[in-house]
């Protein structure tokens, strides 16, 4: 697993805190949510944030 940059983790955590119902374990849905909730213009950064959020949601689902 790759190490994520700090800004990816910070923004992902902020999005999860503010909009927990906007995200789930589906990457494509999370990608659309990141696009609508942020002003990130870079496709690569958007995908990294969506991937991080997806991973966090999947981990939370396994614990529950």
Swiss-Prot record:
Q: Which domain of life is it from?
A: Archaea
Q: Name one GO molecular function term.
A: structural constituent of ribosome
Sorted keywords for this record are: Ribonucleoprotein, Ribosomal protein
Q: Which SUPFAM superfamilies match?
A: Rps17e-like
Which GO biological process entries does UniProt record here? translation
Q: Name one GO cellular component term.
A: ribosome
Tell me its family: Belongs to the eukaryotic ribosomal protein eS17 family.
* HAMAP family per record: Ribosomal_eS17
Name of this protein: Small ribosomal subunit protein eS17
UniProt source species: Halorubrum lacusprofundi (strain ATCC 49239 / DSM 5036 / JCM 8891 / ACAM 34)
């Amino acid at each position: 697993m790759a190490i994520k940059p700090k800004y990816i983790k910070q923004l992902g955590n902020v999005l999860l805190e503010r909009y927990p119902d906007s995200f789930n374990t589906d990457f494509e849905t999370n990608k659309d949510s990141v696009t609508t909730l942020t002003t990130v213009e870079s496709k690569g950064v958007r995908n990294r944030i969506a991937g991080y959020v997806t991973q966090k949601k999947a981990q939370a689902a396994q614990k529950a």
